[in-house]
Amino acid sequence: HGVIVMVDVGDLREGVWPDHLVDVVSSAAALPGIDVKGVGTNLACYGGVQPSIENMTRLVQLRDMARAATGLELGLISGGNSANLPLMMSGAMPSEINNLRIGEAIILGRNTLDRSPWPQTRQDTVEVVAEIIELERKPSIPLGRTGEDAFGQHVTFTDRGIRLRAICNLGRQDVNPSDLAPVDPGHIVLGASSDHLIVDMTDSSESVEIGTEVRFWPTYAGLLATATSSAVWKAAATPHRL
């Protein structure tokens, strides 16, 4: 197996600490069936540390140190993920960085440093679809004394009067409701229980009824959750000419 040894240059997620790198590379290379191809790092994840000339140069220096100490080629240097694209496009990425692990920028078309649209990409590539299973006009504020909800939160409510509220067959066991943005700007995600999503449909651009499908754009976290939920069916749309 060809492997990359991950080293931590500041984000404090995965990766050995720099002063352990040589020992780990040497030990890994001694294992049967293992071919250490190079080193890599991860940024803009747990700690939100942005890729920079400084931490990328540090990664190159660590590779050079491990190469000199072990005699291994270590020709691959994986500088990070989608968050590295702005640095790369600026021309400031050290030339030794020859690999990036791109996910969100390709799938969702977003700059992961600020979630702005990435140039020449689309942001409508993934939809989360739920079906309306109940549709009722109800008050927008609960009746009676309130405390914590089912998830230990104290929720505040805005009085919008009587509203058309849909219950959809999607819940927190599948995705956090804050990670869903309605495709229809007239829809408002109000919240969710474990298996039900509550959406205000009063200002829907189209008429709705029980059985109507409601569509949402997911954030990266929403895509991660729904893509790994066994209760969410996945389907790939047929490519079409733009």
Which functions belong to the PLM regions below?
Residues 40-43, 79-80, 100-105, 126-128, ...:
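Long, contiguous hydrophobic alpha-helical segments, chiefly transmembrane helices and signal peptides
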Residues 85-168, 174, 178-182:
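Active-site loop ensemble at the mouth of alpha/beta enzyme cores that anchors a bound cofactor
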